[in-house]
Amino acid sequence: MKKHKMLSLLAVSGLMGIGILAGCSNDSSSSSKGTINIVSREEGSGTRGAFIELFGIESKNKKGEKVDHTSDAATVTNSTSVMLTTVSKDPSAIGYSSLGSLNSSVKVLKIDGKNATVKDIKSGSYKISRPFNIVTKEGKEKEATKDFIDYILSKDGQAVVEKNGYIPLDNAKAYQAKVSSGKVVIAGSSSVTPVMEKIKEAYHKVNAKVDVEIQQSDSSTGITSAIDGSADIGMASRELDKTESSKGVKATVIATDGIAVVVNKKNKVNDLSTKQVKDIFTGKTTSWSDLSK
């Protein structure tokens, strides 16, 4: 098993407060000349799974098993917010994030000359994107769960998706409430959580007596929660694998999201190729100055 530095939100807050985050530098020139500080998501993160697949950082061994080649030098963060905070505080850092979760604290890079925007994802020119899925136990959904899902997939729910910077589904239908009470527990991906929170807020305006509880973790935990019944709906920012699908759950796409490669705002780099990103995250390229060679 690979060993990485692991950062949680609490750890980041403490380290940033005293300015000793491992590998960080306050010299802005280091962002384009010094060592590249890789920041990755944790194993189990759907964003990490999609990122390593789309950039070729993952391969299969002779047994057909997937192998993640993310560099051992990477600092691992346990949520989208920690990823963005870590990169924003380290001039030498590079990481990745859900497009819909981005904020102004980091700089978004072009990939192969294309912008990480909804427009370019829709046109197909920016290819680093993945589905947002909800995961449910087939045939076991409670009436309140079905109603909330109907809202997510409706015109109203998809309008929330689009308003928050994600790509909505086509041909959504009008929502009609079918229940007036109940509770829905939702668990999983920290990338899906922000838009799910917004959907929950909008849903409560039309069906206030249904209690919706959202528990943030990661995609794998969300899928497991749907499988074992501890959650009514799992959130996953990746597709189900064969093992998961065989356990009686199904995935339903609720939106499409891009994955943006991000650096510190002091960094002078604006554009990387797919190969350059792969070489950085696998540890082949370790210095910012190597990118200009």
Curated annotation (Swiss-Prot):
Keywords, sorted A to Z: Cell membrane, Lipoprotein, Membrane, Palmitate, Phosphate transport, Signal, Transport
Location(s), subcellular: Cell membrane
GO biological process: phosphate ion transport
Main location: membrane
A cellular component annotation (GO) from this entry: plasma membrane
Tagged with keyword Signal: yes
Signal sequence residues: 1-23
Lipid anchor positions (S-diacylglycerol cysteine): 24
Its membrane topology: Lipid-anchor
Lipid-binding residues (covalent, N-palmitoyl cysteine): 24
Source organism, top-level taxon: Bacteria
Similarity comment: family membership: Belongs to the PstS family.
Binding partners and assembly: The complex is composed of two ATP-binding proteins (PstB), two transmembrane proteins (PstC and PstA) and a solute-binding protein (PstS).
Function: Part of the ABC transporter complex PstSACB involved in phosphate import.
Protein name: Phosphate-binding protein PstS 2
Organism: Streptococcus agalactiae serotype V (strain ATCC BAA-611 / 2603 V/R)
